[in-house]
C-alpha cells in the first residue's frame, strides 16, 4: 500500500472541516470504494472529522444510486433536505441533488469532466460550500 503515502488533503480541507465541526455539523463520507476508504482518510489526516463512512463495497451499489445516499443519511440520523453534499463528478452531485440534498460539484484544477447541465452548483473550493452554509443559517 505504498500509494497511501502520497495522499494529502487539498489546502482548504482542514479549515473547512474545522468550520463545519464548530458549527455542529455531522460529517460523513460517501465513496465508490472499498473499506480501505477509512485508511485513506486516516493517511490524509482527516479521520477525526468524520462520523460516518459509507462505501459502495458495503452498500452493494455505486453513486448515484439512491441506496448509498440513504445508507449514509441513516448512519448520521439526518435527512437529505438538511444535508450538504460535494462531489467532483457531476452525475453523482446531480444524483444527490435529485434526492433532496443541497449538492455541489467541485471543480479541481480547472477540470470539469465535460458536463453539459446546469452550472449553478459549481464550486472551486470547499470554502465556497462553507460560505453557502453560513449564509443559509443566518
PLM region descriptions:
Residues 21:
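Conserved ATPase "switch" residues in P-loop NTPase domains
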